[in-house]
Amino acid sequence: MKVETPVSGVGLGLRRALMGPLSQARDYAPESIPFDFMEVAPENWIPMGGRQGKEFRAFTERYPFVAHGLSLSLGGPEPLDFELLKSVKSFLKQHNIRRYTEHLSYCSDHGHLYDLMPIPFTQEAVYYVADRIRQVQDFLEQPIGIEHVSYYAQLGNAALGAQMSEIDFVNAVLKEANCELLLDVNNAYVNGINHGYDPLDFISALPGERICYLHIAGHFDEAEDLKVDTHGSDVIDPVWALLDHAYQTFGSLPTLLERDFNIPDNATLFAELRKIGGYQQLYPSAAIKSEDWQKPAQP
């Protein structure tokens, strides 16, 4: 299987706390840098100017980037925020960002909820959110990817209104919206433990031809049967095993490490990135870059 992807290799999510340490790493020999692309949440960087804005520009001139949105609220009841999308579209163009992705969730209901809330697994919700995804793709004039989110309510319970399983819901949205998938391996693990399904089966049932890239991250063990997606710790062995399974199923695909806090030193962080690369080398690449990356034009 071959998949047209916007980037290739190993990725790292850029956080402000990483800018200093990674700026030092820019002086390393290129072959010692264990990542090939980076990801940012546009809401955190669009308004940035001054010194930090220049530092950010230095990163986008050096590496291919993708953008992962936080606040579009694709499943929310309020109209889509086209002012935000206008800013996102300009941001993508300014920094030659290769793909925009968002969460299959909602985060606003007459005000921002400051969390990513899951969408009910119903046919009505499939049609509703798919229509909004198509509107976003039309406005941005490019495909977008959606990420299946971690959730903690029993949304798959028919007694609570569920009409389908999580995997059937995700696949129905992908087909109806004709969009791409951001496969989050840690979310599959967390949801599998919390809701009693096999994450191996979940990943195997996804349409590999729609995957634009993957996320991998750490989580918090609240209890044996309750895991919380935090991006604040090292990736554990069962999640690495799921990544290996994804590569066995689909072939090696671009994969990005998310680390939001408790950020370790470069040596420790780079070791996890190299581990991703090690798994990728075990399998034939399934990725075909959609176009060659070029340095962003100067403003």
Curated annotation (Swiss-Prot):
Pfam entry (one): MbnB_TglH_ChrH
Ranges that cross the membrane: none
InterPro entries membership: MbnB/TglH/ChrH, Xyl_isomerase-like_sf
Signal peptide residue numbers: none
PANTHER family xrefs: UPF0276 PROTEIN HI_1600
Family membership noted in the UniProt record: Belongs to the UPF0276 family.
Protein name: UPF0276 protein ABO_1518
Organism this protein belongs to: Alcanivorax borkumensis (strain ATCC 700651 / DSM 11573 / NCIMB 13689 / SK2)
